[in-house]
């Protein structure tokens, strides 16, 4: 999402648990979505290949609807919650702006909070050696941007030369220096394991060793810069304001390429495969089906698909709105809550809603969406994206 299994050889709960690792730990797929290339790619990572075979056999047993069923997706998270809950009073799961990974025994976990700029490492192994904590810290800080499920031990020394992955340029050491090289990463990890380990007690009475690592103050901007080339390319291709694309990404995921929500939505622009993703596949890419999780966890593909959907909203679903600024506000609201709810906010029917929107100023349209849209989440979303858009306009 290890060995192949026959139908019925795993119970439903075990199969869900096996698939959960893939829901929470994505990998990058090859340029072409062919089974041959996927097989070649998977062969490089035996553990993932075994999980993939298990998952596919389970899907054969349940039927294809298991891939898109919200109840089954919720069950994936519930399976992890159950396993982790045996050890942790508070079970943490990945969210759009938070990446959480447990070790295989569920006794250690790492959390990257992309919104607030923090890395939190916890272990129930209170007798862990300093060296073990150092390695846990180093692995977390070196989470790669393309596949966080790959063991860092598989990577060459050259690729592990300092923090070159997801947190590149966002970690400063005890001296206030950017942690760029392997020797500095190692030294900082040792300092943290010696000076910043706290002992806490959970509600269930178990002790936890905890290390809090703050990210740099400009962590959001540093991550944003990583994805700027893809944003600019998608902007040119689909003729969408790059500042709006950046604002959407910032609001949806805080530039976390592995963002996942219970909807389920995936990746930087939080695309729902069975709605927006399917629409883009059919109308823009001229492909059947819908994007896979693998597709949407690829930052370039996610940005292009999300931008293509913004273009669809602008030029197809909301093209009857004459004022470009009014249309932009409606596009923002529709990206979150759908075009139908935008029309509902202005009276229900498409024709009457368009007439009412076109009779208002752009500021009045904004205020109406902020106060009269049927979904509170969308009302707040319009405000957040609007503010983010202003922040990114000078940068693109």
Give the location of each predicted region.
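Cell-wall glycan-active module
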Residues: 2-6, 11, 16-250, 315, ...
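Short glycine/proline-rich turn/loop motifs
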Residues: 208-215, 284-293
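Short, functionally critical alpha-helical segments immediately adjacent to catalytic or ligand/cofactor-binding
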Residues: 239-263, 271-272, 306-307, 331-336, ...
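Short, solvent-exposed loop/turn and secondary-structure capping segments
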Residues: 258-261, 281, 344-348
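Substrate-binding/active-site groove segments that recognize
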Residues: 262-290, 304-312, 358-360, 385
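A short, structured beta-strand-centered segment in the mid-to-C-terminal lobe
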Residues: 291-301
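Catalytic and binding regions of secreted/periplasmic enzymes and modules that target cell-wall glycans
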Residues: 302-352
């Amino acid at each position: 999402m290890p060995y192949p299994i026959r139908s019925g050889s795993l119970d439903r709960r075990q199969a869900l648990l096996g698939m959960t690792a893939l829901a929470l730990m994505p990998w990058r797929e090859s340029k072409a979505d062919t089974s041959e290339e996927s097989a070649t790619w998977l062969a490089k990572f035996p553990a993932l290949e075994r999980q993939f075979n298990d998952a596919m056999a389970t899907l054969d047993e349940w039927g294809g609807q298991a891939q898109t069923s919200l109840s089954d997706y919720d069950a994936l998270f519930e399976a992890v919650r159950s396993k982790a809950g045996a050890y942790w009073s508070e079970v943490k799961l990945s969210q759009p702006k938070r990446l959480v990974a447990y070790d295989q025994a569920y006794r250690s976990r790492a959390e990257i909070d992309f919104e607030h700029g923090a890395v939190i490492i916890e272990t129930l192994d209170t007798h862990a050696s300093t060296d073990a904590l150092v390695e846990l810290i180093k692995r977390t800080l070196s989470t790669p941007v393309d596949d966080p499920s790959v063991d860092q031990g598989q990577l060459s020394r050259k690729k592990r030369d300092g923090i070159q992955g997801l947190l590149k340029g966002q970690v400063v050491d005890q001296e206030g220096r950017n942690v760029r090289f392997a020797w500095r990463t190692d030294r900082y990890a040792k300092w943290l394991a010696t000076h910043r380990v706290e002992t806490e007690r959970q509600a269930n009475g178990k002790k936890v060793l905890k290390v809090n690592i703050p990210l740099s103050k400009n962590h959001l901007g540093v991550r944003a810069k990583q994805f700027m080339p893809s944003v600019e390319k998608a902007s040119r291709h689909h003729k969408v304001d790059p500042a709006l694309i950046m604002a959407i990404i910032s609001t949806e995921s805080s530039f976390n390429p592995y963002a996942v929500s219970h909807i389920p939505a995936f990746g930087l622009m939080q695309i729902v495969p069975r709605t927006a993703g399917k629409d883009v596949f059919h109308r823009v890419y001229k492909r059947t089906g819908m994007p896979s999780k693998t597709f949407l966890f690829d930052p370039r593909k996610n940005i292009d698909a999300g931008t293509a959907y913004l273009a669809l909203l602008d030029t197809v679903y909301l093209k009857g709105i004459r004022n470009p600024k009014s249309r932009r506000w409606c596009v923002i609201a529709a990206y979150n809550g759908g075009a139908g709810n935008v029309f509902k906010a202005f009276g229900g029917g498409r024709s009457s809603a368009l007439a009412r929107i076109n009779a208002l100023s752009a500021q009045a349209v904004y205020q109406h969406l902020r106060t009269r849209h049927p979904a509170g989440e969308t009302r707040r979303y319009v405000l957040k994206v609007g503010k983010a858009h202003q922040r990114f306009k000078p940068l693109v």
